[in-house]
Amino acid sequence: MENMKVLLGFICLIVPLLSLETDKCTEYPNEVISFSSVNEIDIRSCPLTPNEMHGGTIIWYKNDSKTPISADKDSRIHQQNEHLWFVPAKMEDSGYYYCIMRNSTYCLKTKITMSVLENDPGLCYNTQASFIQRLHVAGDGSLVCPYLDFFKDENNELPKVQWYKNCKPLPLDDGNFFGFKNKLMVMNVAEEHRGNYTCRTSYTYQGKQYPVTRVITFITIDDSKRDRPVIMSPRNETMEADPGSTIQLICNVTGQFTDLVYWKWNGSEIEWDDPILAEDYQFLEHPSAKRKYTLITTLNVSEVKSQFYRYPFICFVKNTHILETAHVRLVYPVPDFKNYLIGGFAIFTATAVFCACIYKVFKVDIVLWYRDSCSDFLPRKASDGRTYDAYVLYPKTYGEGSFAYLDTFVFKLLPEVLEGQFGYKLFICGRDDYVGEDTIEVTNENVKRSRRLIIILVRDMGSFSCLGQSSEEQIAIYDALIREGIKIILLELEKIQDYEKMPESIQFIKQKHGAICWSGDFKERPQSAKTRFWKNLRYQMPAQRRSPLSKHHLLTLDPVLDTKEKLQAETHLPLG
């Protein structure tokens, strides 16, 4: 399994190299020179900024080799993440190494010259690998053992450091020196303190312990006057934090390397073993000023407690002559009403869309339910002066011919439901007019007295007078569309696919209002008003307050039908 992981890691490194020959990498002109001690473990990072390395892949090469350095942790020289490891460094490792960073848009290349050195004769170090650090005479300061961040343990703690001066153990109990993490604190700096200091530690890698050594050339500065440190952040500010959350407080200072930067809360410094508060230190050379550094002390708060809101966290910057402070006060977050508004608006919109969809699907049922349930509680409308709820217009047969299903629907089924069950009042020519009356006058008068015009259509219009071509139909449609503004309801007793043979007025009504298609049979039996046809027809009819017609009145419809059938052949001439 371990070999498989190594193989996969190597494949992941080698795949981006397939296009190496064709890609042009931008090479940094500045060369980085690095020194290492022979037989010691050493780790080198790619000297690019975090912004330059963001989103990219780091690959290391030695000299002019086209083969990347191995990612196998068992190799003495190998790449681990973006770092180059020497476990340990050997004299033959000297040379130059290329760190190449590439992503989907660009490629950066930087050169590092590596020198692996042996100790100078009679010394425990090589002077070429020395780091120069300076402190002011008569002041307090610290020497820092550099580049130990790579060797933190699993608890993110720096290793224990031993200090030597001129290769002899340095006593840390004489009042002038004491050790603190990776720092050697020097109190009341004097000229005799200058010299070469060595810090030593060790690091265990894959079960084997390797030495780590750094040498520092300590130079004293006679003039103790120095610039005042500047706290870049915080600036006496407040910070919103939720109770129980994890936060970081960053104290960013521009000052001298020896300035102390630390946090206090409620008058006390942060203890090193505090389970909730922990400090982390970092220093960088200032990019725009010589002999100045960016000192960053981060206070990690693993859990915001209620007492943290009572007192501010104070950042202190201290040297021999100056003490600067700045604070951060934690406050409870202000409720973000914007999210509530957005959420409420989203819920309202979703509800509105849902209701609109429900209404569109069940519109007919909702309107009919409202009429049946709430009409008694609404104020009565003023009378519109009309007598009939609908004027029924249907095709007339030529001569003595008759279509029984049409007569059954017009004179039996339609009145039975609309008049018998829902109390509507219909005017049906041939039932409600009198023998001998002028058809044009009857039509003109009764259309004006009706609230709706129901036009009944059948598929085979060839056996009927054409709707809209006889005087009766022309008057009815004209009055409904033009003069009276009456709503027209088209009823298809049979499914009609082609309306091109229909009069233009019928085509216009069909296009604008559609038609209701009959889906039942024409047997003379009680009709259920709960079918979709009758619901759609009732929806198109005006709201009704009257009670259904009595059973006695309904029984009179059949004699009327018989009278119609008997008189039709005698008095009713085909229209058209």
UniProtKB/Swiss-Prot annotation:
This is Interleukin-1 receptor type 1. A soluble form (sIL1R1) is probably produced by proteolytic cleavage at the cell surface (shedding). Rapidly phosphorylated on Tyr-499 in response to IL-1, which creates a SH2 binding site for the PI 3-kinase regulatory subunit PIK3R1. InterPro entries: Ig-like_dom, Ig-like_dom_sf, Ig-like_fold, Ig_sub, IL-1_rcpt_fam, IL-1_rcpt_I-typ, IL-1_rcpt_I/II-typ, IL-1RAcP-like_ig. The keyword Amino-acid biosynthesis does not apply. The active site is at 473. Receptor for IL1A, IL1B and IL1RN. After binding to interleukin-1 associates with the coreceptor IL1RAP to form the high affinity interleukin-1 receptor complex which mediates interleukin-1-dependent activation of NF-kappa-B, MAPK and other pathways. Signaling involves the recruitment of adapter molecules such as TOLLIP, MYD88, and IRAK1 or IRAK2 via the respective TIR domains of the receptor/coreceptor subunits. Binds ligands with comparable affinity and binding of antagonist IL1RN prevents association with IL1RAP to form a signaling complex. Residues 1-19 form the signal peptide. Its main location: membrane. Belongs to the interleukin-1 receptor family. It comes from Rattus norvegicus (Rat). The interleukin-1 receptor complex is a heterodimer of IL1R1 and IL1RAP. Interacts with PIK3R1. Interacts with IL1A. Its EC number is 3.2.2.6. Residues 386-541 form the TIR domain.
